[in-house]
């Protein structure tokens, strides 16, 4: 008998999930008392280094990994309390794609996409019709008769995505699905996933170790370390103001600000002998990323500046600008106006 839980907006609720692996020597706590809620239609990212517990956690969503403790609620149903027959029904509504495409080399593209439908009571004509619809959806309608060996990595992943959608799932789990792809192909796959999210109202749970992937596609993110979620929230909030060291490290890999600061401090050519300089890192968000705050500062305080580093990221549709500036001028100007200058800067931080 299915155990129904009132969940109006959340399609996934993981409550107090713990996964223990035991051997003769020790007990490994792969997932440690994790709570996670994913809203219907969201693109939710889970980021962490290898061994953080990301894959183990998401495999509990369809009980491919049964948790030692905790509740797994999908579409309002506590799926730990249902029988195998009903669990198969739930699993049909959860598609999965992986880093390795796992296509069958002996089957054509069409045959690979049809495969999940073979255990359904669907005749051959309808199976093929569904597979052709999916091929068109992922942009591979010209490769119906091709075999996996004839496809590029990006094309293989598109076939894998189409296959994962065969049973009209409401949830798609993406486990490092772009890790084996080059940057250009990764971008095209992420664009496809965003498109599918909008067209099908498909909830996507995406695992990655790359912040670039998170900022490109996700609306919300959880950061994992040692089996725990250590930080969670909107991607823009996490990107603007990470509170944990691991999160900051991931953000730094995407912005390159940390490396730029180290390079600037180390390099003497940025220093002007006899001139007082102050190095400032500015972060601009939203509309302020396009405002002329620096020119306003220069005009108001008669202070010179040199832009040593600048870039603008787009995170979940929001512009976030990063700038490292060396302000220079007479000591008295710098000292007398420094607090006013900082006030102007921080007024434009958010």
UniProtKB/Swiss-Prot annotation:
It catalyses: L-methionine(out) + ATP + H2O = L-methionine(in) + ADP + phosphate + H(+); D-methionine(out) + ATP + H2O = D-methionine(in) + ADP + phosphate + H(+). GO terms for molecular function: ABC-type D-methionine transporter activity; ATP binding; ATP hydrolysis activity. It is an enzyme of class 7 (translocase). Keywords: Amino-acid transport, ATP-binding, Cell membrane, Membrane, Nucleotide-binding, Translocase, Transport. It is a peripheral membrane protein. Its EC number is 7.4.2.11. SMART domains: AAA, NIL. One of its GO terms (cellular component) is plasma membrane. Pfam families: ABC_tran, NIL. ATP binds at residues 48-55. InterPro entries: AAA+_ATPase, ABC_transporter-like_ATP-bd, ABC_transporter-like_CS, ACT-like_dom_sf, MetN_ABC, MetN_ABC_transporter-like, NIL_domain, P-loop_NTPase. It is found in: Cell membrane. Belongs to the ABC transporter superfamily. Methionine importer (TC 3.A.1.24) family. Part of the ABC transporter complex MetNIQ involved in methionine import. Responsible for energy coupling to the transport system. The complex is composed of two ATP-binding proteins (MetN), two transmembrane proteins (MetI) and a solute-binding protein (MetQ). This is Methionine import ATP-binding protein MetN 1.
């Amino acid at each position: 008998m299915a155990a129904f839980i009132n969940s109006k907006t959340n399609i996934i609720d993981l409550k107090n999930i713990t996964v223990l692996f035991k051997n003769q020597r020790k007990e490994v706590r792969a997932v440690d008392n994790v709570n996670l809620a994913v809203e219907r239609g969201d693109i939710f990212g889970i980021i962490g280094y290898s061994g953080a517990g990301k894959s183990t956690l998401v495999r509990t969503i369809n009980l491919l990994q049964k948790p030692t403790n905790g509740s797994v609620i999908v579409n309002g149903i506590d799926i730990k309390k249902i029988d195998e027959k009903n669990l198969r029904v739930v699993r049909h509504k959860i598609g999965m794609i992986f880093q390795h495409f796992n296509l069958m080399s002996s089957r054509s593209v069409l045959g690979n996409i049809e495969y999940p439908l073979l255990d359904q009571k669907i005749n051959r004509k309808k199976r093929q019709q569904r597979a052709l619809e999916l091929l068109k959806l992922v942009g591979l309608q010209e490769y119906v008769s091709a075999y996996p060996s004839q496809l590029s990595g990006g094309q293989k992943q598109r076939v894998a995505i189409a296959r994962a959608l065969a049973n009209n799932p409401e949830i798609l789990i993406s486990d490092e699905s772009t890790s084996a792809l080059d940057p250009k192909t990764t971008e095209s796959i992420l664009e496809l996933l965003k498109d599918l999210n909008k067209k099908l109202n498909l909830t996507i749970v995406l695992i990655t170790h790359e912040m670039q992937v998170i900022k490109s596609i996700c609306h919300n993110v959880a950061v994992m370390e040692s089996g725990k979620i250590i930080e969670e929230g909107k991607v823009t909030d996490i990107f603007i103001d990470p509170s944990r060291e691991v999160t900051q490290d991931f953000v730094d890999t995407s912005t390159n600000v940390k490396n730029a600061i180290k390079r600037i401090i180390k390099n003497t050519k940025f220093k002007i002998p006899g001139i007082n300089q102050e190095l400032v890192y500015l972060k601009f968000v939203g509309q302020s990323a396009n405002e002329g705050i620096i020119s306003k500062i220069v005009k108001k305080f008669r202070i010179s500046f040199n832009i040593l580093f600048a870039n603008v990221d787009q995170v979940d549709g929001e512009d976030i600008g990063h700038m490292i500036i060396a302000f220079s001028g007479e000591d008295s100007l710098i000292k007398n106006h420094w607090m006013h200058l900082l006030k102007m800067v921080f007024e434009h931080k958010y």
